[in-house]
Amino acid sequence: MDLVNHLTDRLLFAIPKKGRLYSKSVSILNGADITFHRSQRLDIALSTSLPVALVFLPAADIPTFVGEGKCDLGITGVDQVRESNVDVDLAIDLQFGNCKLQVQVPVNGEYKKPEQLIGKTIVTSFVKLAEKYFADLEGTTVEKMTTRIKFVSGSVEASCALGIGDAIVDLVESGETMRAAGLVDIATVLSTSAYLIESKNPKSDKSLIATIKSRIEGVMTAQRFVSCIYNAPEDKLPELLKVTPGRRAPTISKIDDEGWVAVSSMIERKTKGVVLDELKRLGASDIMVFEISNCRV
């Protein structure tokens, strides 16, 4: 990391170096036109489009680097932020990496409720979150609780089968790994997703930070919305605009056809099928949907 000390003219942006968050983080950077080339031998890459240096770190370490002001921005999961117990701004929900940190027990075992695990051994890589959860469950402090929390760095789901613990606290996304290990969830400690996090005391120019955040917000908006354009009879316009109110307001333009107007509006991607059906039912015609590659909101 000695190279970092020579990058005082660049904003340091911490990115997960591998795992479930890496590829989607890179996709968001590409969408925000933060271009870079990463050498396989280095965990630092210089952006060719902005004065930014990307620092590739384990997702669990990113909250600490951002919280201590070593990096101005980072991408990581809320679970890692809470586990690190650092003070950072959760700037933008990036809408990926959605999963739950859950208490899991053997499916055919004796434990059905988390209260039954008081005084037992819990295996996890999220020690602080597990300690807080079970201390609260016992109604006491971490120092005084009877439940034992044991740390392992990986393959947490194998712990019960190997006799290391009575239960585990681990992340669940689809649940396939949990079921394959013969486990079932009985409680949720935390729901999490990936966020852009920001240092409380950034060292870089605030306008550059604002530019990066604006670009990423644009990417997120483009992923969430599509552009809907259609022709509408003027006498049906009030009803049609209830279906497509837009983010702020729709754009309405006169066309060379008496009694008709053209309407352009942003609609949520997940509702486009229902919206198009309703527009057609209400009398709209020439209804089209276009992808939004990027935007500023």
UniProtKB/Swiss-Prot annotation:
Keyword field: Acetylation, Amino-acid biosynthesis, ATP-binding, Cytoplasm, Glycosyltransferase, Histidine biosynthesis, Nucleotide-binding, Transferase
Principal subcellular localisation of the protein: cytoplasm
Residues bearing the modification N-acetylmethionine: 1
Gene3D superfamilies: 3.30.70.120, Periplasmic binding protein-like II
GO function term, MF aspect, one: ATP phosphoribosyltransferase activity
Localization (cell): Cytoplasm
UniProt catalytic activity: 1-(5-phospho-beta-D-ribosyl)-ATP + diphosphate = 5-phospho-alpha-D-ribose 1-diphosphate + ATP
GO cellular component labels: cytoplasm
InterPro entries: ATP-PRT_HisG_long (IPR020621), ATP_PRibTrfase_cat (IPR013820), ATP_PRibTrfase_CS (IPR018198), ATP_PRibTrfase_HisG (IPR001348), HisG_C (IPR013115), N-reg_PII-like_a/b (IPR011322), N-reg_PII/ATP_PRibTrfase_C (IPR015867)
Pathway assigned to this chain's UniProt record: Amino-acid biosynthesis; L-histidine biosynthesis; L-histidine from 5-phospho-alpha-D-ribose 1-diphosphate: step 1/9
EC number(s) from the headed UniProt entry: 2.4.2.17
GO BP terms: L-histidine biosynthetic process
PANTHER family listed in its UniProt record: ATP PHOSPHORIBOSYLTRANSFERASE, ATP PHOSPHORIBOSYLTRANSFERASE ATP-PRTASE
Known role: Catalyzes the condensation of ATP and 5-phosphoribose 1-diphosphate to form N'-(5'-phosphoribosyl)-ATP (PR-ATP). Has a crucial role in the pathway because the rate of histidine biosynthesis seems to be controlled primarily by regulation of the enzymatic activity.
Family: Belongs to the ATP phosphoribosyltransferase family.
The name this protein goes by in its record: ATP phosphoribosyltransferase
Organism: Saccharomyces cerevisiae (strain ATCC 204508 / S288c)
Gene coding for it: HIS1
